[in-house]
């Protein structure tokens, strides 16, 4: 080990204080001093849509935890938005999953009005997992959110994990909310959701 007394920055071009948590990069990790901040878990059963607000404008990532989401005879969809409206265009959605015999299925939707799981409308579908939305401030002036969702369906255990990936261009909106919806307009049967952010 090199003793601290042997290290000197004098004569270097480095100025100022290097925070330990940033590893000298000047970029502070969101996981320092607490990590993800979660709101209270919410029962979303008995209504068609539930909106979660209070995501700060400074967030870098949004995480949503699904526990026992049973949409009924409809598939779930979800959107991001701000206080004026939800984003209703420009979602690029790619869903894939594998069966017990290693058959892989893929569904891709280009420029639709939500992230979604089309075709999964059986009343026994019950979803567990999480999704992350990574915020990307593009050089073209728009903000994009890259989605990574990983789910398991306890109603159909012969399937492996379900992955839903994609992105949405939210333009200049400052996203502060997330909503989950039953696609047919019927009430969601059951589910417990929790939303957090870094």
Would you name each region that the model predicts?
Residues 24, 28, 33-198:
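Surface-exposed molecular-recognition determinants
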Residues 1-33:
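Register-specific beta-strand positions within repetitive beta-rich fiber domains
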């Amino acid at each position: 080990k090199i003793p601290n007394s042997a290290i000197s920055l004098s004569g270097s071009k480095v100025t100022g204080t290097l925070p330990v948590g940033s590893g000298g990069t000047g970029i502070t990790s969101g996981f320092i001093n607490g990590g993800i901040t979660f709101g209270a878990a919410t029962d979303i059963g008995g209504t068609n849509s539930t909106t979660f607000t209070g995501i700060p404008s400074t967030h870098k990532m949004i995480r949503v935890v699904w526990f026992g989401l049973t949409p009924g005879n409809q598939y779930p969809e979800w959107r991001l938005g701000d206080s004026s409206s939800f984003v209703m265009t420009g979602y690029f959605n790619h869903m894939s999953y594998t069966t017990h015999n290693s058959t892989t299925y893929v569904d891709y939707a280009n420029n639709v009005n939500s992230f979604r799981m089309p075709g999964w409308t059986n009343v026994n579908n019950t979803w567990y997992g999480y999704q992350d939305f990574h915020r990307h401030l593009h050089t073209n002036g728009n903000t994009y959110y890259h989605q990574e969702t990983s789910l398991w369906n306890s109603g159909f255990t012969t399937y492996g994990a379900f992955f839903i990936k994609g992105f949405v261009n939210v333009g200049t909106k400052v996203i502060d909310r997330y909503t989950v919806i039953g696609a047919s307009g019927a009430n969601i049967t059951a589910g417990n959701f929790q939303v957090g952010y870094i």
